[in-house]
């Protein structure tokens, strides 16, 4: 589609459509055992992908036709993502950030239902604040009720998966945590947009958790490349 209007976030801020915000990148580290598994599965993926000219599309198509090497390669893709997305360090870091913002409305974004549920359960056990989950396994009515209740309570926490990236408007949400994310810039912008809606006097924070020395960092750099904002590495 053609670009009709192009505007920077600073211009949108001056118009009062978004609030002042900060993006903070939070590095995590694998323990030696985790890193060994990560390197092993990455090497398997590299080897199998090399058999298909390092073309992921060709690899995917070959796996669909039953090619054994391609299937192993696709399993390596899935295995690496699981190691990255569901690592317990994400749970610990997300809970610490949630505790730092005890009085604010928070949205936690995850790539998997397992991580989403784990964070929600941990927060429920450790704090006396409302916690909700939102993902594809909920019915349409359940999703509507979750959004309604989350929006009505000031210090509530919403743990969600990809299903929430588009179409939700809760202006009072001021903290976002990307507990796990992809390389997709559009997804990042949608997630950022959930917490920077313009409200007078509001300052928003978006935290991005990522594992150093892994593909996770590459995905973060890809989705935030050339972003017109201040990003803090902490």
Regions found by a protein language model. Name each.
Residues 1-103:
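Interdomain helical connector at the RecA1-RecA2 junction of SF1/SF2 helicase-like NTPases
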Residues 1-3, 18-23, 127-130, 171-175, ...:
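Short glycine-/polar-rich loops that comprise or flank the Walker A/P-loop
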Residues 32, 88, 113, 161-162, ...:
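Alpha-helix N-cap/helix-start capping motif
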Residues 37, 187-191, 223:
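Alpha-helical scaffold elements adjacent to nucleotide-binding pockets in ATP/GTP-utilizing enzyme cores
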Residues 105-109, 114-124, 128-165, 187:
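Conserved helicase ATPase core of P-loop NTP-dependent helicases/translocases
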Residues 111, 136, 181, 209-211:
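Cofactor-binding loop segments of dinucleotide-utilizing enzymes, especially the Rossmann-like FAD-
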Residues 157-160, 166-182, 187-188, 203-209:
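A short beta-strand element within the Helicase C-terminal
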Residues 194-223:
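Conserved segment of the helicase C-terminal RecA-like domain
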């Amino acid at each position: 589609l053609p670009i009709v209007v192009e505007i920077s976030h600073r211009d949108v801020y001056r118009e009062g459509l978004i609030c002042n915000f900060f993006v903070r990148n939070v590095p995590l580290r694998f323990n030696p055992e985790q890193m060994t598994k990560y390197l092993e599965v990455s090497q398997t993926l590299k080897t199998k992908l090399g058999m298909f000219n390092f073309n992921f599309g060709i690899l995917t198509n070959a796996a669909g036709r039953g090619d054994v090497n391609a299937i192993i390669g696709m399993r390596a893709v899935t295995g690496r993502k699981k190691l990255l997305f569901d690592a317990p360090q994400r749970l610990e870091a997300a809970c610490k950030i949630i505790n730092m913002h005890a009085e604010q409305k928070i949205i936690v974004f995850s790539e998997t239902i397992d991580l989403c549920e784990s964070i929600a359960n941990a927060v429920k056990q450790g704090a006396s604040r409302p916690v909700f989950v939102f993902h594809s396994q909920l019915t349409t009515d359940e999703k509507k009720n979750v959004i309604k209740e989350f929006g009505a309570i000031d210090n509530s926490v919403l743990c969600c998966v990809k299903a929430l990236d588009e179409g939700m408007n809760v202006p009072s949400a001021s903290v976002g945590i990307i507990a796990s994310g992809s390389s997709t810039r559009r997804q990042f912008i949608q997630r950022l947009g959930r917490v920077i809606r313009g409200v007078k006097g509001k300052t928003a924070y978006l935290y991005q958790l990522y594992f150093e020395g892994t593909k996770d960092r590459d995905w973060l750099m890809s989705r935030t490349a050339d972003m017109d904002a201040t990003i803090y590495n902490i």
